[in-house]
């Protein structure tokens, strides 16, 4: 066995692991819980798992992702480097910290809470009542004596029945477990929180009445790449904390297919469940509790919106049938789940609500997002597009809805792009390029003066659209102009440099390559061809659309003009487009606060038709036609012109 020491560019504490001869650095890192970004799940195709060899030797051929200069400097792909001695390697920020760092939001400006406030108003206007069964009551009791020996549970039950006027009181195990201590520390003056339904009060938490904390709901959006969550006051709806972080499963692959393949290996289900629960949700929720200044026991309801595969892996359920014809998941919805069942940082007795799935590749994130978009409450035809790894689309109105997923891949969230990253600090989120000089102007996420680290989805859309507009690239995405920012490697592959090494925050060049552009063209082609096939299956075209709602966490917002220019969205009146942000998280927030919203989302799921694109005979033909800028049929995009 060899010793492998992982050091980190950001100065984090080194991790020491052991590796068997022939084991790759990526395999060793995974076993040691060292996060190295590997969107391709270690098959060598993405080039993102770069590490720097500081000491020792590894075996493995140099790949096209490592230049001669970088190879000489010690850079290796961890998936292609087999350990052959004791080694020390450095994991760069772009492969770890920038992709997985948790971030809590500043709620003081009001910008972060606007979508949630507006959602409550919109759903109420649509007839969805925003109320729930949670109540908290403050009670005082006589302290026991030698003459009054009534047990604590009976003493509490008696006063609760009188205070609430209910027929029956049930005390949860967490409540009873700490009851004796809380009663005596509080002088038998406590506040008890729980649900009141049909005359039965289910007590979930008891605390000192002089130390009040709100009853809280936890809403979570589990994306394939990014996980976002909020803590909200269950009675007022006030947002108490909001944050996000990378999905810890990312090191096992950027898309759901790679995750399913990994979970099929020995111990894979347990590894992937641990990655999402213990390595992602637990630390994120703890950070949110600290930000909100509430104890985890005060989280009394948890609502999760995620795709079908993420739901299965969250619960530790085999997801392999999802990818195998006829694509049948183990479940669409799951009732009776408690936070303690899956080790959530919350009151163990808190109900976990999973937004229902619709099909193998259209999950609860889309039903929650559809709830948010309110296309179900409109007479006119609307399109809802979620720009995530799966690329889900819903079309319809109050009379019917149809959904599909088009496997766009992780490009919209920076995956499969050589310098791609999530929309966190340092991400290039908007780009304009001068027609004559090809010099870029960049908008970067973060504080003033932030240097670029990589490029997120909205920035990728912009740079490809701008390169096409300025005639720097062809319809196939190949570079056709010469310029100081258009460079080529020894194999002739071109790249456009957004930031030279001395201009970036990492000291490395930030560029978009022809391979990146081709990858993104496939992703945008999947979106447009899915829209086209869905409408065609109903004998309709884009002329019927009156609203297009675009969701996803790919940046602060998409430049719709550029999205149309590259052929991702239909060339219709731009006033039809509305970017609605993380609609999945907003939907989970509604589920946390409203019993009626939970009923509504199940109704939406049961009434939505699922279109399986793989069975549509013309889909591949349409997809291939859409894999050009903007399309092989340029008549579909009259406004997309080159200068």
What are these regions (language model features)?
Residues 220-224, 229-257, 321-334, 368, ...:
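Glycine-rich phosphate-binding loop of actin/hexokinase-like ATP-binding domains
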Residues 397-402, 406, 540-604:
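Catalytic phosphate/nucleotide-handling subdomain of diverse soluble enzymes
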Residues 468-538:
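A contiguous, well-structured pocket-lining segment that forms one wall/lid of small-molecule binding clefts
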Residues 248-290, 416, 427-432, 519-522, ...:
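N-terminal phosphate-binding loop and adjacent alpha-helix
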Residues 306-321, 492, 540-543, 552-571, ...:
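Short glycine/threonine-rich loop-to-helix capping motif typified by GTGT followed
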Residues 28-37, 48-98:
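Iron-sulfur (Fe-S) cluster-binding segments and ferredoxin-like electron-carrier domains
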Residues 281-300, 531-546:
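Phosphate/pyrophosphate-binding loops at sites that engage ATP/ADP/AMP, CoA/4′-phosphopantetheine
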Residues 70-72, 77-219, 224, 273, ...:
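Nucleotide/phosphate-binding catalytic cleft detector across ATP-hydrolyzing
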